[in-house]
Each structure stands twice: as C-alpha cells, then as structure tokens.
Amino acid sequence: CLVGSEMCIRDRLYTDSVELIHYARNVIVKHVNIVQIMTYYSLGRWIVETQQMGQKRAKYGSKVIKILSEKLQEEFGKGFSEDTLKNARKFYLTYKERISETVFSLFAIEKSETVFSLFEKEPPFIVSWSHYLQLMRIENEDERSFYEIESAKSGWAVRTLQRQYNSSLYERLALSRDKNGVLRLAKEGNVIEKPEDIIKQPTVLEFLGMEEKAKYSETDLETALINKLQKFLLELGKGYLFEARQKRFTYDEENFYVDLVFYNRLLRCYVLIDLKVDKLTHQDIGQMQMYVNYYDRYEKLEDENPTIGILLCKEKNDALVEITLPQDANIYASEYKLYL
C-alpha cells in the first residue's frame, strides 16, 4: 500500500492489533486481569492515534472502528464488536496518563513479559474491566477515582459498585468533610480514622423495599434492617460487626434498650444506633447521650475508644442537634432515605 495513505494506515492498525491480541492470549492465563485491561488500553490508544493522525481532532472518524471491528471479528470472533472498541477508545482517553511510554512499549510493541514485574510492584489498574466500564460513566475525576479505590479496597462486585454510585456514596461522605477531606477521598478512598469518617448524610435504605409514605413503626424499621443485615452493613461502611438488637442494660433498677449495637473494629469502639421514624427531638438526643455514657463507663475496655452514638431519623434539625449536644460529643444524627 502507499505509505501514509488511509488504507495503509488502517492495514497497519489491523496488523498491530492482531499481533497484540495473539500475544495477549498467550500470556493471559498468568495475568488475566491486567492483560485484558492493557490490551483494551493499547487498542484504544492505537484507534485514537489512527483516527487523529497527529491532529487534535479525529481525521478519519468512526469508520476506523467499524472496519477494524469487522476484521478482528473475522479473525477472533465476537469479542471485538464496535461497542467494545469504542469502550477501548474511551478507556484510553479516560486513563491515558496512567501508562508511561516505556510500559506501553514493553507491553504493546515489544511484547516483553518483563512488563509484568513492573505491574506487580505498582499496578496501573486495580479493578476488573467490567468495573472500568462502569467507572468510565462517571464524569468527575475525583469521584471516579474514589469509586475505583473503594472497589479495590472493599472488594466490591460490579453490582455493589453500581449500588454505591446510585446511592451517591461519594457525595454523602463528602458532605461531612472539609476541602482537604474531600481531596483525600479521591486519593485514598474512605479512610476510617475518627468517628466522623463513618457518618453519611443521608443514610440510604432503599434495599429494605419499604414504601416511603407507608406508616411504619420503629420496630418495623428495625426488623427490616435485621432481615437485610448484610446490605445494611454495606451501607454503614467498613469495619462493622453486629452485636445485638434491642440490647438491654439495667441501671438503678431500670431497664433500657438500645435498638442496634455494633462494634467497629477499625475505630475500636462500640457504635450504638437508635431508630426514629419521626422528626428528631432533643429528648431523643438526650436518651442517646445516656446510652453512650453507660457504655463508656461500664462496657468498653480501657484500651478501647469512646462509644459512638448514631441517631437514624426521618428528619432532623441541625441547629437543634448542635445546641443540645456538647461540642466534643460522640453522637451524630443522620437522616435516612427509603429510596435512591
């Protein structure tokens, strides 16, 4: 073909792609996830470079993908549809800063297995291709980074990632943080170091399947949460261990009952949760303060941290909460929502 012609450029793209896919299939058994992702990254880069030919805007447009897809499917089957190649292109454009020229050359050009030792020391991609298909839909870079890190650290399945994104986990955590705290979310995920790190505004309980306008009691809500305990633990966040429901304690010959008692192994403290299906009152806050005081004085060990109290309520008045509680109180109020 005539060097520099459109046909020659497309043929080169196809030839390079075939060689790369054959290479990837040979090494994929050992390094299945990173090989798959790097293959799509490399295809995406070549597609962009072929379309643009060094220009800022694409010169040849979508027909490059259409022609390449047809040829690759003849060679390898249905795994390289137009949609797949479009996703590869989008993936490269989204994450192109992740891969250095040296690493790209070792993988896609030289096809050297020494590149995998670099990946083991510092993996450029930390979740599966299916996760990245979801992550690429997130426009905000900091938010996208947060969900990627949390997916890897918490072992989220793709379905869990979708649920956490749909419930606006990033925004709910960000609401209780300052600017530096929000930046840290994007770089490190949700690091649990202090009581404020476990609070979400609001707490989303859509998995209970309860109607928003239906009349229900605190016992109904509590029962629904226990029946869906695994999903409730996911919504609460990291480090939670369930201890008891309606935990009774006796003080001065009077019995009291805490709705839900958890232990957070990351914060090394008890977490008491009281459920309120109406607007939060100062009496509710005072009651939780008494529960927390009791646990701090009679239940927690010397080397454990102070007890945390969380009031899950239908509605709250932030000014009322602030004026009722002392500044150093380990008690938090969070509204719950029964729908996303």
Indicate residue ranges for each PLM-predicted region.
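Basic, low-complexity intrinsically disordered segments
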Residues: 5-6, 10-340
